[in-house]
């Protein structure tokens, strides 16, 4: 009896040990980098015809392409199912279109179905041109409050009392859409003369809101006021990144335009770009970024309009083609997985209107599955540019980055502590913002794939 019980407990302990071992293995797998990477597998990817997308898959996955109208092949074989374990897997486009790639764990457990779009090759004319940017906001932006000295010698703050704060955007007053500082002042003064309050529609990050303010007669201006400073437009100098030669769609700056006082993004109602000339350079140094001193020229001669102010710059249509002495013909774009750490060049203007090529180095690549800024870390290596400007300065935003004869991105920011270094954004995101290629859905930043350098076949 005791021997049977002992045998039973030994068997039970053995089974418990095996169960604990299996549970531990499952937990270890779930918390492993490989599982976290697999969990972040995107549902939708794009490749350009002529590219070979090379992936490092760090787990035993079976990769197969659907049999219907396949536009890609795996590992240089049509309609092939392969099992990848810590070795590269390549997806090679064979024609334009859309395919479905299926991933299975251990070749058995269905895990994810990924849609792959094969896009036509895209060629753009590189920029580098110095441009003047004039952007008019949707509504007017509140940039400050100011007490109003009344006829009774007292200070009143009607706008502040109504809850209006810096950064608010005034969309309309008394139901009338407003577009300029002058229009705002006239409506408020007219309401005050008629002894009426003003109903103000505000736009805020969390939505729209109506507030009511009572205009008071200002003893200094003899006009009715509510004590606000507003701005209806922004202007500055930047750099053209590229344009598409057929449609004349362009991209510039590489980052969003914000109001200088509130740092709030400006909703684009309308805008224009004009030619600008660089008349001087404020040299950049550690802790003090430099700046291009630009002057608008031929303001009546518009280069194009501005239809979008986004996280990745401004976009619109050029009225005519802009010549580029450095690149007279359109050149291909490189998707982010083609970008390599190493030498590259940037195009920008540092004197007059002459576009120059300067050597830089791409030092870090932050591969992104969803649109994010600061995808590239770059460093100026050209002694001519360092001597002239100290490195990257304000006004260089949008300067195209070219590597191996392809546009890979644009300069966006300078490091305050090191003006020879800064950030750039991938051209992928700029093309999506411009509408040249459709946007893809935002996915988790966690990755199944460790993207290796892609090979490109012309």
Model-derived regions, located:
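Serine endopeptidase catalytic core focused on the charge-relay Asp
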Residues: 20, 212, 216-390, 394, ...
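PDZ domains, with a preference for the canonical peptide-binding region formed by the helix
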Residues: 82-96, 172-201, 207, 418-420, ...
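Interdomain regulatory linker/hinge segments that flank or connect interaction modules
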Residues: 2, 14, 24, 33-36, ...
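Solvent-exposed, low-complexity, repeat-rich "mucin-like" stalks and linkers
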Residues: 13-17, 27-74
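Conserved PDZ fold ligand-binding element
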Residues: 73-82, 159-182, 401-404, 408-413
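A short glycine-leucine-enriched loop at secondary-structure breakpoints
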Residues: 155-169, 192, 391-395
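N-terminal Lys/Arg-rich, disordered targeting/topogenic segments
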Residues: 1-11
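PDZ-domain C-terminal substructure recognizer with occasional recognition of PDZ-binding tails
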Residues: 103-121, 173, 185-227
């Amino acid at each position: 009896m005791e021997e049977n019980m002992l045998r039973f407990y030994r068997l039970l302990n053995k089974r418990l040990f095996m169960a604990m071992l299996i549970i531990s293995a499952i937990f270890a797998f779930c918390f492993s980098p490989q599982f976290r990477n697999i969990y972040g597998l995107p549902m939708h990817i794009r490749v350009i015809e002529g590219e070979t997308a090379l992936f490092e898959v760090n787990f035993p996955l079976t990769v197969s392409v659907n049999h219907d109208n396949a536009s890609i092949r795996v590992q240089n074989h049509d309609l092939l199912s392969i099992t990848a374990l810590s070795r590269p897997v390549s997806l090679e486009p064979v024609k334009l279109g859309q395919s479905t790639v299926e991933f299975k764990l251990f070749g058995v457990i269905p895990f994810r179905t990924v849609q792959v779009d094969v896009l036509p090759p895209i060629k753009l004319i590189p920029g580098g041109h110095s441009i003047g940017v004039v952007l008019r906001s949707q509504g007017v932006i509140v940039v400050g409050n100011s007490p109003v000295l009344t006829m009774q010698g007292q200070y009143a703050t009607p706008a502040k009392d109504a809850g209006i704060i810096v950064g608010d955007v005034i969309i309309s007053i008394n139901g009338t859409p407003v577009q300029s500082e002058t229009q705002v002042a006239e409506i408020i003064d007219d309401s005050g003369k008629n002894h009426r309050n003003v109903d103000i529609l505000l736009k805020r990050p969390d939505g729209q809101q109506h507030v009511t303010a009572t205009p008071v007669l200002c003893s200094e201006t003899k006009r009715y006021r509510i004590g606000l400073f507003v701005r209806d437009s922004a202007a500055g100098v930047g750099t053209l990144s590229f344009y598409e030669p057929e449609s004349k769609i362009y991209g510039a700056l590489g980052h969003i335009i914000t109001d200088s006082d509130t740092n709030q993004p400006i909703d684009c109602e309308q805008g224009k770009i004009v030619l600008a000339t660089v008349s001087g350079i404020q040299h950049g140094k550690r802790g003090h970024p430099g700046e291009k001193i630009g002057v608008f020229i031929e303001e009546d001669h518009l280069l194009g309009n501005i239809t979008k102010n986004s996280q990745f710059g401004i976009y619109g249509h050029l009225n005519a083609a802009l010549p580029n002495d450095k690149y007279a013909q359109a050149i291909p774009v490189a998707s982010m997985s083609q970008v390599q750490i190493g030498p590259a060049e940037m195009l920008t203007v540092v004197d007059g209107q002459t576009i120059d090529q300067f050597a830089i180095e791409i030092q870090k690549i932050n591969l992104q599955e969803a649109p994010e800024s600061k995808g590239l870390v770059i460093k100026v290596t050209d002694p001519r540019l360092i001597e002239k400007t100290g490195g990257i300065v304000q006004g260089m935003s949008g300067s195209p980055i070219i590597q191996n004869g392809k546009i890979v991105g644009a300069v966006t920011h300078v490091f305050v502590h090191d003006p020879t270094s800064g950030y750039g954004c991938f051209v992928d995101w700029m093309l999506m913002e411009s509408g040249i290629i459709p946007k893809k859905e935002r996915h988790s930043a966690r990755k199944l794939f460790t993207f290796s350098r892609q090979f490109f076949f012309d």
